[in-house]
Amino acid sequence: MKKKKKNYTFNKKNKKIYNIKEAIQLLKNKKSAKFIESIDAAFNLNIDPKKSEQNVRGSVLLPHGTGNTIKIAVFTTGKNIKIAQLAGADYVGLEDLANLITNQKKKIDLVIASPETMHIVGKLGPILGPKGIMPNPKFGTITKDIKKAIQEAKKGKINYRNDKNGIIHSNFGKINFSEKELYENFLTLYQDIKKSQPNQFKGIYYKKINISTTMGPGIIIDHLSL
């Protein structure tokens, strides 16, 4: 006889800790919004964000992407201009692109730059920095391989970094993804953040992890079972 699948119930006052597979099933059962919600994770790390050597940042390609369509701007020169356009960049240029960003007339989700253009891109720090899209070699967004950077971003590569409270917030899929896809995306993200643990850090790395839909409450994950 086929084993009946459990159905988990949840409300805002529920403080129970769930394993990740239970939590994902719970979110999918609870969906109520009239749009396709994103699934987000919050990793509360036991680091001191005031110490630069303990800050965590990185990038990872999720096996099933995020389900988001992103707008990519590329600063580059020479033959890479055509390469960027063919790879699917939405905006490509130099000073003209810098002016577009300065005037904030277009929605841009990711900025990629060739190394030789950073004298222009660097001046955009006050605009791009607060949005978390300033090109950075640690994220692979300052690169000579423009084509690869664009293709990976389109496939679902995400960048992450802790905020001032030591928490990493990241999207890892949509509510219409299968449970298997969400689980594999979450596990990939979790393992990459774990791999990025600072060398100087000692002790328990994860304080708490929870996941939620765009409009829903957080569900606490039993990270010790991962």
Swiss-Prot record:
Organism: Buchnera aphidicola subsp. Cinara cedri (strain Cc)
Record's keyword annotation contains NADP: no
NCBIfam families tied to this protein: rplA_bact
Protein name: Large ribosomal subunit protein uL1
Role, per record: Binds directly to 23S rRNA. The L1 stalk is quite mobile in the ribosome, and is involved in E site tRNA release. Protein L1 is also a translational repressor protein, it controls the translation of the L11 operon by binding to its mRNA.
Keywords, comma-separated and alphabetical: Repressor, Ribonucleoprotein, Ribosomal protein, RNA-binding, rRNA-binding, Translation regulation, tRNA-binding
InterPro entries: Ribosom_uL1_bac-type, Ribosomal_uL1, Ribosomal_uL1-like, Ribosomal_uL1/biogenesis, Ribosomal_uL1_3-a/b-sand, Ribosomal_uL1_CS
Pfam families assigned: Ribosomal_L1
Family assignment from sequence similarity: Belongs to the universal ribosomal protein uL1 family.
Keyword Acyltransferase included in the entry's annotation: no
GO BP terms, alphabetized: regulation of translation; translation
Gene3D superfamilies from the UniProt entry: 3.30.190.20, 3.40.50.790
Subunit structure: Part of the 50S ribosomal subunit.
Entry GO MF terms: rRNA binding; structural constituent of ribosome; tRNA binding
Cellular component per GO, a single term: cytosolic large ribosomal subunit
